[in-house]
């Protein structure tokens, strides 16, 4: 059955100027936006993101790749899955590929989305060609953070009756580096604002269960790990652990960049993605290559 293509507004207030009205595929419980042709690259957003987080990539890479950016389950126009776990998220990524008519794809993940990419590569290795892992980590709590305390801190605003729209600007400015433009911030705030509170809550409950350190060596897909030199959420040290544990990885550290590399320096990020995925034309693995 062909995918239904509908036009929907991605964002309403408070930042309708930055709403992205475009072709969005809605197939069953999953929604995604796609652009371009070529080898498929699936973009997986972070905890406070949505498919709109990837607009610079959807526009900047569409001449080389079929770019697919989803709303993860419980976010945007995608219905929740219960329980929300890394296993059910990975299975949802595989279901997205099925519904998009894709056998094997590159996965590009930011932060929480990078964790999704890792779990998908472990759970559905035959579906994954190459990985781009930006501002992410191989495990929660590498700095000793207590999961219960972290959840309580992240949920305090929602427990007090605030919405994602209420907290979006403060959260994003606290994690971004100085290179984030006003327009890029507005786009990210608008995307965060459309996250349902229930979806954000479920994601916060899920995230501390992430730990794939002992299984990284089982991932055969070549990986590009991108870290921000100013990232305090997932510091460079986390990316080094990740790159060291993978079979075939290279690590790039972007000086002066915080936790939102895909939005802070989109042209640089797109160039890295274009070069790395381009080396895997035909969706076949390549030999190891390191860049520190």
Predicted feature descriptions by range:
Residues 28-79, 96:
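Conserved HGGG/HGGXW glycine-rich cap/lid loop of the alpha/beta-hydrolase fold
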Residues 88-105:
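Conserved acidic catalytic loop of the alpha/beta-hydrolase fold
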Residues 109, 113, 117:
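Gly/Ala-rich beta-loop-alpha elbow adjacent to hydrolase catalytic centers
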Residues 118, 122-123, 129-160:
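Flexible "cap/lid" loop of the alpha/beta hydrolase fold
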Residues 142-148, 161-217:
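Conserved alpha/beta-hydrolase catalytic His-Asp/Glu region
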Residues 219, 225-227:
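Short beta-strand/loop motif that positions the catalytic acidic residue
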Residues 229-234:
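Acidic catalytic loop of the alpha/beta-hydrolase fold
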Residues 249-292:
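Catalytic active-site module of serine/aspartate enzymes centered on a nucleophile-bearing elbow/loop
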